[in-house]
Amino acid sequence: MEPKYSILLCNQSLEEYQNKIDGWLHKGIKVIWFGDTEDVDNLKHRFADYSKALLLLAYEISIQKKCIIIDGDDKNGFVDKYLEKECPLFNAAQYQVEHCNDKKHIIVQASAGTGKTTVMIDRILFLLHTNPELHLSEVFMITFTNDAADQMNRRLQDALMLRYDLTGEKKYLRWVEEQSQMNISTIHSFAYFMLKEYGIGESFTKNLSIRSFQFERKELIKDVIDDTIDTNSNVRNQLGVPFYRANSMVNDFWNGFSKLGISHRDIGKMNWGKAIDTGSEPFQKVMTGILNRLDDEYFDIKRKNEAISIDDIMRDLQEVLQSEVLPKPDITMKYLFIDEFQDSDLSQIMVSCLMVKLLNPCLFVVGDVKQSIYRFRGANDQAFYVLKHDMSELHINRPEEFTLVNNYRTSASVLERMDDYFEVWGRMGRLQYDKPVVPFNQDPGRIRMIHGEKNEQADEQIARIASRELDALIDRVENSEDEADEKTRVVMLTRTNRELSQLASTLRRNRIPAVIRRDGSFYASETVRDFYIMVSSFLFCDEPKYIFNYLLTPYAGEIDRMNLNDMEWLHGDYENLVSYLDNYLEQTNWKKYHKDLRLRPVLAVLKDILDSESVIDNYILNSKAKMKDDGWEENRIQAATYTNALQYQANLEKLMDILQKNLGGDKVSIYDVYKFLKLNVSTNREESEAEVVTNEEQTKSLYKSILCMTVHKAKGLEFDTVIIPYTNRTFPTWEKTEILIDPIGRKVGWNYTGDTEKKNKRWKYPAMSNSLYKELKEIDTESTKREETRILYVAMTRAIHNLICIVPDSKNEKTWASLIEEVGIDYE
């Protein structure tokens, strides 16, 4: 029997198989060889290109057992019995996942750095090779971010093109062409697609749009509460709080169910306990009485508007898929892959099961419970348990389960020291850490715990360490034959955006080049600010302050330096200021563009400005001049302006795309552009800066600046050196106005902390709660501690060669510092 995808040969005659191996490799068949040292060396030398591409895997083995396994058909369990024990370099678990029966559902637990993306790509290649009728359009893959979807697309395409380059087999080109039809998307894009296919039974059509519905939700809450109470009686007595406060609390509490993905039908099955006192009874009664009605009427609003909201799109899809009337969609789904499954909420888990039930695909989910760090979005750290429970309830075949433990990312010396921490946290019940991973990276590395200094010395210490590590990395790269890539970076990771802002200020103050990646910062970026200033100058051309600001932007180009002392002598006289600034304005093309804006389409003129003016070059010149004035060293000026200019350029391209999508058309005025920018600059804190896509040459220079981001932003990434500068932040476990929901136990606890009058601090509105809050708060506190431990785990496992944690003395057990101290610290 000839192999379709792979052949495993153990202790076979190389003389007998050498020509066959040559033929298999040239057809794209993976060959896995186990033999003596001489045979292994011969194969790796003769088929070096295939070995480098991992199409040939050759391992030394001491046992004399013989075996041939074709396409993973290991009926006698040879891999488990012998190869896993006798050849640690062979990744038996990855082999078994890759070659698992194509009719099986699969769950893969993959710790950080164990190659989960690789195993997903290899699994798809196995399915393509062994199922001639399979098309990539029948393979669906769900990721949790657009970046992850893009990366998966790139990795699959690279794998197919590499095989084509090595073999010349046309099937790989055909699969590359088919790849554009493969459904790799984020969870929300997938839900939107499925709602358009299945939603007709609930009066949704394929014209379904996406809206926020924030206004409609607030109005609905107001109307339902208003309809519930007697307007002729005291409102506060019926609600326990004023109407406006009840409105806000109901909105927050209702959102709590949406966030966790609790379905509409399950909301009505929740146990709310009892009010703890007579003062809490009114709100308890209102809340339990209106929740189902809110959900019903909100769903009707969405139906009437033929629109859904991103916030509860998965709940809506679950509701649709569980309805009695389901259309038969024109979808063929043979395989459904879900990445980062530990970040799933209840509705996402149920939807994946319902898709299996309705369309009969084989399910493949991969994730790591130790990296479940999106609890604030509703992620369930018991996602794999819930999945198996839901599959059983729906009578879906039991999945095959695998665990990947071979770590290819982190230096063995670093990983072995990390394991001391992870093992203790596992014994403490803070981390699900069953057994240590096996390190395969033998590069030198180091983990350092540095005693944190106090108060104002803390920032200086952080800057010293950052500067030292940056210089050390630059020195290593410039004295190495290896070229730098996107992983060759010093990265500083923070827990919160507030810490990230503090870190950015510290590095800037100490003249250290740094790139800050934060969510929602696009409309606060230099790029948008400068563009907004330019647009404002055209609209308010008679006001000196707008012209002055314009002259400071890269759009003004190289002009004579303005003297602020000269301007002060004008004492704010309007005519003199206009005349003074006009001298500088004449050195630019501003007046030409101002005239063009009256004669030509606005967006066309703005595009001309970007094409004609050397905006990026001017930005670099301005930045260098300012840094030089501020005392920066020349090499750090070069590093900072290089990375900042790349980001500026990427943001500029993104801004023009946004303007074109939102304001495209000949009738757009400069005022429309100004109004759009003003609104978003003032309110939009969700749009993130553009992803900088660099070519190979550009990537080689990125290592000269530090990269700063939150741990959540860094998830899935890896870097040469990781610094964790802040470990003394207290975990948020205090009581507050909140709703706590146990979705598995179906319990609900709620609490209102009350309001005090500012002057005399007396209670204006007393605290309220229900009987389950204390119990659920204790559970929530422990859950918070476990999640914070997982976040620290994610931060630490981003490191490849070096990990530095700054650990100050901590008297509070609810900090990262205390977690580290639990294990013991050998301070540097």
Predicted regions and their residues:
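Conserved helicase/translocase P-loop NTPase motor core
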Residues: 93-95, 100-103, 184-191, 217-221, ...
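Conserved P-loop NTPase-based nucleic-acid remodeling module centered on helicase motor cores
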Residues: 35-37, 55, 137-246, 382-386
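Helicase C-terminal subdomain and adjacent C-terminal extension
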Residues: 18, 42-59, 64-69, 744-769, ...
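ATP-hydrolysis module of ASCE/P-loop NTPase motor domains
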Residues: 97, 177-183, 199-287, 342, ...
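Conserved ATP-driven helicase/translocase motor core recognized via long
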Residues: 28, 36-60, 138, 217-307, ...
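Conserved helicase C-terminal RecA-like lobe
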Residues: 486, 535-794, 798
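Structured N-terminal alpha/beta-domain signature
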Residues: 1-70, 218, 222, 254, ...
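Conserved motor-region signature of P-loop NTPase helicases/translocases
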Residues: 2-4, 16, 30-45, 53-154, ...
